[in-house]
Curated annotation (Swiss-Prot):
Keywords: Oxidoreductase, Selenocysteine. It is an enzyme of class 1 (oxidoreductase). Monomer. Component of the glycine, sarcosine and betaine reductase complexes, together with components B and C. This is Glycine/sarcosine/betaine reductase complex component A. The gene is grdA. InterPro entries: GRDA.
Length: 157
């Protein structure tokens, strides 16, 4: 199982899901070192792709800390947008529009609501920051989508 305390955490939250700041509070409650946190509007970006500036930051941070030392935590409200974000940080930008086009970082990537991550977060912090969104998200579909890309593209499982 992944241990958040041993990783540099990059957070890509979702305006319509779990915001970056909420995920940051959760990760910090688990003892993680958060090196970047942002909140995207996946509906606003072209085809639901990851924001180009966030792609650049992810790439730069993976190079700085070593991809084996980095984990990306997502807060997407929908399976498809979460899957696209996971695909981007593992096998590369599927839209071929950003800095990660053709770049396979192979980063470890999870949604904040996945049991492997949720179990490490202080329950009171999770309740306050994530639980309301968890009730309206299709968590099983999100996990299935992210797991597919993580298992296919992550080099550090």
């Amino acid at each position: 199982m992944v241990d958040l305390k041993t990783k540099k955490v990059i957070i890509i939250g979702d305006r319509d899901g779990v915001p970056g700041e909420a995920i940051k509070l959760c990760a910090e409650s688990a003892g993680a070192e958060v090196v970047y946190a942002a909140t995207e509007c996946f509906v606003u970006t072209s085809a639901g792709a990851m924001d180009l500036e966030n792609q650049k930051r992810v790439k730069d941070l993976a190079e700085k800390y070593g991809p084996e030392n980095v984990i990306v935590l997502l807060g997407g409200a929908e399976a498809e947008s979460s899957g696209l974000a996971c695909e981007t940080v593992t096998v590369g930008d599927p839209t071929f529009a950003g800095p990660l086009a053709g770049v396979s970082l192979g980063l470890l990537c999870y949604h904040v609501a996945e049991p492997e991550i949720k179990s490490q977060i202080d329950p009171a912090v999770y309740e306050e920051q994530v639980s309301m969104m968890e009730m309206v998200m299709d968590v099983n579909a999100i996990i299935a989508e992210i797991s597919e890309y993580r298992n296919k593209g992550c080099k550090f499982l």
